[in-house]
């Protein structure tokens, strides 16, 4: 459950932004580049959290 929650928390903002772009391509002008980059990088932090979660539950 913890891994699925971590995956969902990390990837949801990125996918929401992608779906928003799909329905409204003009949104790229309204959302700043740092926000786009943050969501993109936050999604790729998910594999970094997995060993931490595994280690925490292995104690």
Curated annotation (Swiss-Prot):
One of its GO terms (cellular component) is plasma membrane. InterPro entries: GPCR_Rhodpsn_7TM. Residues 1-2, 59 are cytoplasmic. Residues 24-37 are extracellular. SUPFAM superfamilies: Family A G protein-coupled receptor-like. Its main location: membrane. Belongs to the G-protein coupled receptor 1 family. GO terms for molecular function: G protein-coupled receptor activity. Receptor for gonadotropin releasing hormone (GnRH) that mediates the action of GnRH to stimulate the secretion of the gonadotropic hormones luteinizing hormone (LH) and follicle-stimulating hormone (FSH). This receptor mediates its action by association with G-proteins that activate a phosphatidylinositol-calcium second messenger system. Keywords: Cell membrane, G-protein coupled receptor, Membrane, Receptor, Transducer, Transmembrane, Transmembrane helix. The keyword Magnesium does not apply. It comes from the Eukaryota. This is Gonadotropin-releasing hormone receptor. It is a multi-pass membrane protein. The chain crosses the membrane at residues 3-23, 38-58. It comes from Macaca mulatta (Rhesus macaque). The lineage of its organism: Eukaryota, Metazoa, Chordata, Craniata, Vertebrata. It is found in: Cell membrane. PROSITE patterns: G_PROTEIN_RECEP_F1_2.
């Amino acid at each position: 459950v913890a891994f699925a929650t971590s995956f969902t928390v990390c990837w949801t903002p990125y996918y929401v932004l992608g779906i928003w772009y799909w329905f409204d391509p003009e949104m790229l002008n309204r959302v700043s580049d740092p926000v786009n980059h943050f969501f993109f990088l936050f999604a790729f932090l998910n594999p970094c959290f997995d060993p931490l979660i595994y280690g925490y539950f292995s104690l």
